[in-house]
Amino acid sequence: MCGIVGYTGVQGASPILLEGLKKLEYRGYDSAGIALLNEGQISIAKVTGRIANLCEKTNDGKDYPGTTGIGHTRWATHGAPSDTNAHPHVSNDGRFAIVHNGIIENFMALHDELTAKGYHFESETDTEVIVHLIEMYYKGDIKKAVIKTSARLQGSYALGVICADEPDKLFVAREASPLILGVGVGENFFASDVTALVSYTRNAIYLEDGEFAEITPEEIKVFDCTGQTVNKKITRIVWDIQAAEKGGYEHFMLKEIMEQPHAFKATIQPRINDNDIVLDDSDLSKEYLESVNKIVITACGSAYYAGCAAKYTIEKLCKVPVITELASELRYSDPLIDEHTLLIVLSQSGETADTIAAMKECKSRGAKTIAIVNVVGSTIAKLADHALYTWAGPEIAVATTKGYTTQLAVLYLFGLYTARKLSRISEEEYSKLLSSLKALPKKIQETIDMNAKIHKIAIKYYDNKSMFFIGRNTDYAIALEGALKMKEISYIHAESYAAGELKHGTIALIEEHRPVVALCYNEALMEKTMSNIVEVKARGADVLAVTYKGNMKIVSVANDVIYVPKVDTLFSAAVEIVPLQMLAYYVAKLNECDIDKPKNLAKSVTVE
């Protein structure tokens, strides 16, 4: 959830650190800070609020000289947002400064131990115990002090450390939190995400859990907990630098909504060879797939809702039970999972803490794992037996859009691939569905082209305090994501319900002019959903229906209708979700919300 950066080289470090922190804003934060090494002294600047405040305080870094430094964006976990609780934190003797992403689970015991030994704490954070431990263990060898400190920590951490006695060095450590080293010429970097590095280098080293590194302008040395050297491969970063910029759009979210046709196509096209689907280097043989008696999809947030939508598609195509589980619940549920379970894990960042923990639990029980992630080299990608990447490019807005639709794209490919392997559908049906899948980017674009109409509808609904989203089957899964989009960026209370459950309590909340967004795409369930619309209309609700072009029945029961292109119902989520994304965007804009960085939210949830 936090973001960390570090630099050592010949340039002034402050502007590079500030720029790197800006690139990490999408992860979510409430405060920020930098620490610079200069002439044997450590200088610190910390602020509550936006990085713009930090730039102002430091005069864009000019008032904080030095060619080695570290930076941090904080999302509060221990201690309220404040300048004092912001990172970097400094040792009592002023010799060390650190930045930390993660949570130290045993920090209270360490805090009590260090307090008893005379160490003074300035903040309420778990992180401060780390810098005092380093000071305690330091006997002239910072490398040994960091290793000894790490051995005392329980939980997750990506650490960046500077020492006044080592003026041109950075020290880093990783455990269950992402950390990437940027390899330059006469300068080197570290960051919690490649987006902070690509403006300066395309060469990266991905640290693994339990690894440490000593970084100077000339070289990077990676070692393990025994101090032994670890040989690491340099990976080329392929993301386009400009892809992380707004490109003329007012917000990243709008830009990313508009990019969905391209992202969807970029995700499916390389995996379709003539009439065959090629799932990268996965070895999902017919023999193995026949042994699978259950597919479990696990994720958090929007990724989970993508799994819920695709569940119906995969189950119908493959004739195999598909269960969707929230990762934060699955990991604690003593799941009935074994070697006959195929686990599909979804995460845009590939670093979602609860998802990683659930994945490890299921792997320990024998499940084979497929990871659907957007970040190459991420923790989840490396943990999985097979990684299938969503080629969405960097997604900066906290509220996911193209990340969600490209996850659907991979899940659709998986469903078709598996159904064909298991001979659960005919070749004729397979070819027809594959053609429908290949047509989806165009259909998504047609939906985006209705943005002017959706903006007009948003004007009608933006000043409400509460909204409901309803649907059946896949439409209900889409309602879940639609409600999430509305609440997370517009701060309007929005809840989703299975349409058939309204009469079991929820209908008591319907009152005059309460907006109800009804997803009505599934023809087989149309009459049932329309009857639910009539029920809420009778109680005064204003109904906005989302349905396929040509469905004229809906006009008689809805106040407003958004028509999206007609596609196979198995793939309808990819087009139905787009107007809901745009509706949430325009409602948030009309309410003057911080669309790209909603309050209290983080893009990449790397703590539990």
Question: What are these language model-derived features?
Answer:
Residues E290-K432, S436-A439, L519-I562, L583, ...:
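Glycine-rich phosphate-binding loops that contact phosphosugars or nucleotide phosphates
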